[in-house]
């Protein structure tokens, strides 16, 4: 009799352990691809999102973050998200314009006067206009993340005037408006995926590139670039995009939990990114790059060049694109 009670107790304890272990295992494992290092604001934001999702779903959903293009280049990642074979891709909006051309309006040179205006637009009417266009192409918009104003780096000379940039071969964003802007400045624009940029700079395939301080510092571009000129020509936000196919298969409570976590992670990432970009210029200089301001009078010359391509962009992007451009211009007056 006593022996039977012992057996029963052991069986019950074993069942409890198995049930506990099963309860702790996530029901859904989602992969999140980030193109940058884990130290960049995007990388830290991705880790924050991972933790917030785990908390909000009580462990039912696990987000696995893969940094520094570990799952492949951005372009392939976006295609996989559309197909439902990858759950999340973090990307600058320029790459997304390959699928949703109207996204290219967000990287018109000298469109945004400041970051606050940009996010007010994206959290408001501009974002509401773009979100269904993304959804139609298979992307569930999870958040607009900050990256900061882009500036030009190169190995030839400091850029203080339009004459200084003429003749440089620069890696640029893969959008028509971005390429047209640099071509109008006399640059040889060379779009390429971010995964290819460091070796291209190292081998002299291109003279330079253009990115915010967070990218320049955390991606260690001081190892392969000499000059960093604060041209402030584009403020390109990031997109956290989830596969529409994956999102719609999740129960409603988990969908709500993920979007709630995304909202909190977005607020957190924006604050971190803006703090980084304010502080990192000194670290970039300490790492060996020569950092120079561009005089306001010179920035006005760059803006004049930029204005020439707005009409071309509006014609290329159709009625919806023109509506977005007009809205962006009006918001930045």
Locations of regions flagged by a protein language model:
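Sec/Tat signal peptide C-region and signal peptidase I cleavage site
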Residues: 17-23
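N-terminal secretory/targeting leader peptides
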Residues: 8-13, 24-117, 125-333
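Positively charged n-region of N-terminal signal peptides that target proteins for export
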Residues: 1-5
């Amino acid at each position: 009799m006593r022996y039977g009670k012992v057996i029963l107790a052991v069986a019950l304890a074993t069942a409890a352990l198995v049930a506990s272990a099963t309860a702790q295992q996530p029901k859904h494992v989602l992969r999140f691809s980030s193109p940058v290092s884990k130290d960049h604001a995007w990388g830290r934001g991705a880790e924050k999102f991972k933790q917030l999702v785990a908390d909000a779903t009580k462990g039912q959903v696990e987000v696995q973050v893969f940094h520094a293009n570990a799952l492949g280049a951005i372009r392939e990642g976006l295609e996989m998200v559309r197909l439902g074979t990858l759950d999340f891709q973090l990307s600058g909006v320029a790459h997304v314009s390959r699928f949703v051309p109207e996204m290219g309006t967000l990287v018109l040179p000298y469109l945004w006067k400041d970051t606050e205006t940009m996010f007010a637009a994206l959290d408001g009417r501009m974002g509401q206009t773009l979100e269904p266009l993304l959804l139609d192409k298979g992307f569930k918009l999870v958040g607009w993340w900050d990256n900061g104003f882009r500036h030009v780096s190169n190995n030839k000379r400091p850029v203080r005037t339009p004459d200084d940039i003429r003749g440089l071969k620069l890696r640029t964003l893969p959008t028509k408006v971005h390429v047209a802007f640099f071509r109008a400045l006399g640059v040889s624009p060379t779009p390429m995926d971010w995964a290819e940029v460091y070796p291209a700079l190292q081998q002299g395939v291109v003279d330079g590139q253009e990115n915010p301080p967070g990218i320049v510092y955390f991606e260690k571009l001081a190892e392969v670039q000499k000059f960093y000129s604060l041209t402030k020509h584009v403020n390109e936000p990031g997109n956290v995009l989830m596969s529409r196919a994956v999102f719609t298969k999740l129960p409603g409570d988990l969908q709500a939990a993920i979007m709630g976590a995304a909202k909190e992670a977005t607020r957190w990432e924006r604050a971190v990114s803006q703090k980084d970009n304010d502080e990192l210029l000194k670290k970039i200089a300490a790492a060996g790059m020569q950092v120079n301001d561009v005089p306001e009078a010179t920035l006005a010359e760059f803006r004049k060049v930029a204005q020439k391509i707005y009409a071309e962009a509006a014609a290329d992007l159709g009625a919806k694109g023109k509506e977005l451009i007009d809205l962006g211009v009006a918001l930045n007056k």
